[in-house]
Amino acid sequence: MYAIIETGGKQLCVREGDTVRVEKLAVEDGAEVVFDRVLLVSTEEGLKIGRPLVLGARVTGRVQKQGRARKIIVFKYKAKKNYRRKQGHRQPYTQVVIEKIEL
């Protein structure tokens, strides 16, 4: 059984027991989080496709940790003008373990 959920402006395919990184959520470590924006659920009977969401479907997970991704470097410059700007960025994320998919 798997589901496709929407969180943080992204769509993720999840199964029970999966560990996924989502955009930062304002919850504590160990807290339960519920994703109710479920776009598709696959069961033994077949696919349930939402238009746009599957009614009554929920995906429950537990927050494992909050973290920050690897640093990326943004470097802008203009040729022959001595204009250079270097900036780093680390995107915050929340790591979630998927516990249950309900329909």
UniProtKB/Swiss-Prot annotation:
| InterPro entries xref list | bL21-like, bL21-like_sf, Ribosomal_bL21, Ribosomal_bL21_CS
Q: Superkingdom of the source?
A: Bacteria
Give a Gene Ontology cellular component term annotated to this protein: cytoplasm
Q: Which SUPFAM superfamilies match?
A: L21p-like
Q: Which Pfam families match?
A: Ribosomal_L21p (PF00829)
- MF term (GO), any: rRNA binding
Q: Name one GO biological process term.
A: translation
Alphabetical UniProt keywords: Ribonucleoprotein, Ribosomal protein, RNA-binding, rRNA-binding
Q: How is this protein organized at the quaternary level?
A: Part of the 50S ribosomal subunit. Contacts protein L20.
Q: Could you say which protein family the record assigns here?
A: Belongs to the bacterial ribosomal protein bL21 family.
Function description = This protein binds to 23S rRNA in the presence of protein L20.
- UniProt-recorded name of the protein: Large ribosomal subunit protein bL21
Q: Look up and give the organism this protein is from.
A: Desulforudis audaxviator (strain MP104C)
- Give the taxonomic lineage as stored in the record: Bacteria, Bacillati, Bacillota, Clostridia, Thermoanaerobacterales
